[in-house]
């Protein structure tokens, strides 16, 4: 596939989830209006068109959209249990556990955390060329806003990957797989033995040959159903004892740069996406929740993923 073609398809697959969820919400709003209402007809038609555009993309697609908590008002789905590579979408779980530890008094958002070659890795637009310390709050913001992998590994190292997995298990998310660190994941798909961290700058000069990102050793993956379940639970404060913890979770999730690319302006949104172009596989995912309706109280929780190539998708 030519690069220009792939870029166009990638942009479409990023925007599609937001088109789907917004259309779903507008179509639901129409159920309270006369069937001849022009806006309602356009919303329903727009949703159908958005669904068709998303499903017409090359490769494997999966989505789940709940209008209302638990899909109480409407539900839209296409292979929601498909196990797909979801890239950086998993970073929401790291944020959740970190804020739980702050809430419990185990960590502080004001703590100074080290940025150096011991944690540095690729895919770090914020911390790639920086050294020194910065407060934990800035690390969490970099992890979600710009999907900075160095920030993610710093945050994961503070809370412990196994404790993030324990939160995932508590939420009942059986399909979700996360790495101990993004650098360990990159080391493996760059050709290092399982469990071997190439370090920095070892990941800049990997041994090869490359491995598929979706594999049975170390990966970043899950189903649309589980991501929707997570956001519905987390944003209903299922995992946070204090209202201020939920406010901070929402504040940071609302900073994700993917939101501005995909969600209509002035729409409250809390989300995280992920993408990875890789030999033989290019993927995009986007998951979270927007709030719509005249009263601004109707949650639309969503996850959409697409994989172009050989995703080794499985039902789990």
Question: Which stretches of residues belong to each language-model region?
Answer:
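Twin-arginine (Tat) signal peptide motif
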Residues: 1-7, 17-24
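Structured C-terminal helix/loop/strand segments within mature extracytoplasmic catalytic/sensor domains
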Residues: 3-11, 28-51, 219, 224, ...
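Hydrophobic alpha-helical membrane-embedded or membrane-associated segments
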Residues: 12-16
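A short hydrophobic/aromatic micro-motif that marks alpha-helical segments and, especially, helix-coil
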Residues: 17, 106, 163, 238-239
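Short amphipathic alpha-helical segments
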Residues: 25-26, 96
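Active-site-adjacent loops and short helices of periplasmic peptidoglycan-processing enzymes
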Residues: 32-190
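Mid-domain, small-residue-enriched loop/turn segments at the edges of structured enzyme/sensor domains
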Residues: 153-235
């Amino acid at each position: 596939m030519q690069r220009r073609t792939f870029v166009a398809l990638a942009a479409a697959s990023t925007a599609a989830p937001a088109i789907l969820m917004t259309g779903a919400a507008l179509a639901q709003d129409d159920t309270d209006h006369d069937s001849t209402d022009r806006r309602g007809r356009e919303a329903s038609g727009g949703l159908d068109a958005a669904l068709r555009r998303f499903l017409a993309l090359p490769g494997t697609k999966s989505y789940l959209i709940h209008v209302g908590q638990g899909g109480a008002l409407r539900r839209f789905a296409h292979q929601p249990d498909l196990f797909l590579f979801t890239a950086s979408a998993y970073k929401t779980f790291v944020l959740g556990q970190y804020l739980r530890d702050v809430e419990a008094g185990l960590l502080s958002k004001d703590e100074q955390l080290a940025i150096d070659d011991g944690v540095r890795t690729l895919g770090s637009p914020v911390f790639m060329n920086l050294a020194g310390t910065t407060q934990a709050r800035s690390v969490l913001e970099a992890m979600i806003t710009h999907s900075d992998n160095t920030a993610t590994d710093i945050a994961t190292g503070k809370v412990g990957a196994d404790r993030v997995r324990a939160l995932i298990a508590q939420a009942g998310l059986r399909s979700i797989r996360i790495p101990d660190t993004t650098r360990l994941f990159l080391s493996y798909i760059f050709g290092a033995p399982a469990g071997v961290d190439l370090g920095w700058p070892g990941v800049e000069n990997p041994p090869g040959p490359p491995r598929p990102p979706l594999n049975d050793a170390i990966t970043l993956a899950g189903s649309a159903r589980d991501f929707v379940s997570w956001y519905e639970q987390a944003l209903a404060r299922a995992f946070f004892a204090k209202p201020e913890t939920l406010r901070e979770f929402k504040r940071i999730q609302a900073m994700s740069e993917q939101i501005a690319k995909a969600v209509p302006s002035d729409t409250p949104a809390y989300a995280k996406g992920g993408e990875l172009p890789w030999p033989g596989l290019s993927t995009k995912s986007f998951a979270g929740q927007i709030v719509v309706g005249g009263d601004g109280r109707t949650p639309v929780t969503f996850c959409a993923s697409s994989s172009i190539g050989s995703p080794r998708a499985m039902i789990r």
